Structure formats: C-alpha cells, structure tokens
Amino acid sequence: MKKRVIIHVDMDAFFAAVEQRDNPELKGKPVIVGGVPGERGVVAAASYEARKFGVRSAMSLWEAARLCPHGIFIPGNHKKYQEVSEKIFRIFREYTPLVEPVSLDEAYLDVTGSQKLFGPGAEIGKKIKKRIFEETELTASVGVAPNKFLAKLASEVNKPDGFCEVREDNVLDFLAPLPVEMLWGVGEKMKERLNDMGIKTVQDFWELPEFFLRKKFGVLGQNLYYLSRGIDFREVIPERVPKSLGKEITLQKDSSDVDYLLGKLLGLTMAVGRGLRREGFYAGGISVKIRLSSFITYTRHSRFFEPTWMDDVLYREAKRLFLENYHGELPVRLVGVTATPLVPVGGGRQISLFGEDLRRENLYPIIDRLNHKYGNKTVTRAKILKISGRG
C-alpha cells in the first residue's frame, strides 16, 4: 500500500479571529461569537482571550457570560465567514483536489500525489499555512502525518498558529506521552474508567491486547487499540471529484488551415496537461471537440491504456482524433480538448512505466515550475515541438 501524506488544517478560533481582524479594537480582547447574553443560543466561537476564562464552543451564552462577564459578545455574520472560508478552500485546492471539508474552518487534504509538483508534505503544509496568513490575515494550525487521525492530533498539539509533522518513524514517540483523552471516543466518563484501570497515557494502552479491550469496551475498545498505535485506514473523501478537465477556444475567424488548427489544438492540450498536474490528476482518456462554421459539432473520444498527464502523449492522441475526423469540408469555428475520466494521482492507476517513460513523466512538474517562475513556454519539451511539426 502506498504511504499516504495527509494534512489537517484547523483555523484558530475562526469566527472570533475574523471579527478581531475586521475590527482592530477587538484585538487582544475576549470575543465571544454566537449571540448576546440572555439569548437561548450557544457559543459558536471564542477567542483565545475568552478561552482563558473557560469559555468554549457549544457552551450556552448564559454560561459564557457567567464565566467571562467582561467578554464582548457578537451575534456573528455567517455570510462573511463563508466568504473567508471559500478563499481558504481555494488555497487548499491549488495543492490537491483531494480535500475533505469538516466545517467552514477545518479540512483534511491528501497530498500524497502532489509532492512531485509541490515538494514534501511538510513543505506543502507550511506553504498552505503561509498562504492563508498572507491572503486572509488569519492563523491556522497545521498537522502533517501518514493518516487522518495523526494529522488531526498533530494540528492540535501546538495551537494556536501551530505546525507539527508526525513522520512514520516517530509515530509511537509522538503518541506515547499524550493523555488518553486525546484519543477519539474518550470523553470524560471513559477517561475516568480508563484512569481507574491505570491507563492515563496513550502508551499505557500498549500493554493491553486487542481481545481484552474489545471484550471490555466493545467496538470502541478495538478502535482504541488501533488508534493508540497510530493506525487509521480512513481515506480523505473529497466533497466532489471532478469527472473531466477541459479547454476550448472559439476562433477569432473560422479557419480550414489544418496547421493553424493543430497549433491551437497543441496550445489547448498543453493547458489541459498543466491543469492535470496542478490539480493532481492523470487523464484516463482524451476527447476532441470540433465545431464547424455550420455549428455542426463532432466530439471524439479515446481511452489511454495507461492514464497520463504527459503533454506529448495527450497531444499525439488529440492530433490523431482531429485528423481522422476533420477533412476540410467546412471551416472550423471552435476546437476543444478534454481529459476524461480523471484518475487521482496516488490511486487508481497501475504503474507500469519504467526507465525513460518514468523520467519523462517526472520531468513535466519540473517544466511547470520553471514556466510558472519565468513565464509560460519558457521551457517546452522538444518532443512536443517535433510532434507539432515545429521542430
């Protein structure tokens, strides 16, 4: 099984932090979002200044006012929080399409297949954290680990504004000293039962066999056996996985010039290739769309034996489909290229590439980074130019 790299991002006191950002007079003060004292509501978020008084999310507003009588209570503005959240999630999706939202201010990201393009998981986590602060003026706590459970724990240990990476070789060292209540499923009552048994830290679980924990606590006991050892098989489940990625262009003037049309097809194919690599997908196949001046439209599709993101492979097949289906009967008005179905990088593809093919595949993310830094078309593979008839 391929080793996964999961990032958990949790914004720090999100709603309250947005209010403090937008109103400098609130900075450094105990801000409580959710309503005003006397209402029958609950706390939606509390700034860290308010948390020092014991105020927590989901607490009644009445209790929050009792604990923090000098707190600044704000009804909140969900529309504003939603807009900020959308900006943050757009940042996430620039690094991977595998984003599982937990709430407006929290998400899991599977960046296993994004490392060729953006570097190791820890580097991606730091980039995301930096981008969030630069673009929203808000802090986030980020955890990077081999699975969702460990990534969430990692994001919690250094809050607020924290960063923590748990590597496969230090999972047990990371878990050992943590109190048992850090494990999912351990509430106050369960904590008391475990403490009565002498189990106070995660390491204490390691002395107990699985059958004993299952007999004592049922399915929860079995879960605790695995979690205490850092084992979690759950996958990051995106809100939605796109089925295709495409580009099309309506020509400024209808044309029957095949060389000109193939040039446009090449540009579209390279743009689709960049999009695949940026979004973390391979193309399982490719479709070419040809709309004639009469508005008659042809769409032809071909499947790849091996899903790919390589521009030369994409273009060779797109060119074949175009030439087999356009015979110059009428000028072309529109041409388009679509990669479909999409295969997420890191899953769903049987790797059979080796030698030169694998080196070629790994070369494209490097070309993308150079072109991103110095401008598109700064670097283009000679093979692309040869296929297009331009080299």
UniProtKB/Swiss-Prot annotation:
Alphabetically ordered keywords of this record: Cytoplasm, DNA damage, DNA repair, DNA replication, DNA-binding, DNA-directed DNA polymerase, Magnesium, Metal-binding, Mutator protein, Nucleotidyltransferase, Transferase
Per its Swiss-Prot or TrEMBL entry, what cofactor is needed?
Answer: Mg(2+)
Enzyme Commission number(s) of this protein: 2.7.7.7
The protein's site described by Substrate discrimination is found at: F15
> What does it catalyze?
DNA(n) + a 2'-deoxyribonucleoside 5'-triphosphate = DNA(n+1) + diphosphate
Locate the UmuC domain: which residues?
6-187
The note describing how and how many cofactors are bound reads:
Binds 2 magnesium ions per subunit.
Residues at the catalytic site: E106
- The UniProt record gives the binding positions of Mg(2+) as D10, D105
Instruction: Provide the Gene Ontology terms for cellular component.
Output: cytosol
Q: Which InterPro entries does the record match to this protein?
A: DNA/RNA_pol_sf, DNA_pol_Y-fam_lit_finger_sf, DNA_pol_Y-fam_little_finger, DNA_polymerase-Y, DNApol_IV, IMS_HHH_1, Rev_trsase/Diguanyl_cyclase, UmuC
Q: Name one GO molecular function term.
A: damaged DNA binding
Self-association and partners: Monomer.
* Family statement: Belongs to the DNA polymerase type-Y family.
* Role, per record: Poorly processive, error-prone DNA polymerase involved in untargeted mutagenesis. Copies undamaged DNA at stalled replication forks, which arise in vivo from mismatched or misaligned primer ends. These misaligned primers can be extended by PolIV. Exhibits no 3'-5' exonuclease (proofreading) activity. May be involved in translesional synthesis, in conjunction with the beta clamp from PolIII.
According to UniProt, the name of this protein is DNA polymerase IV
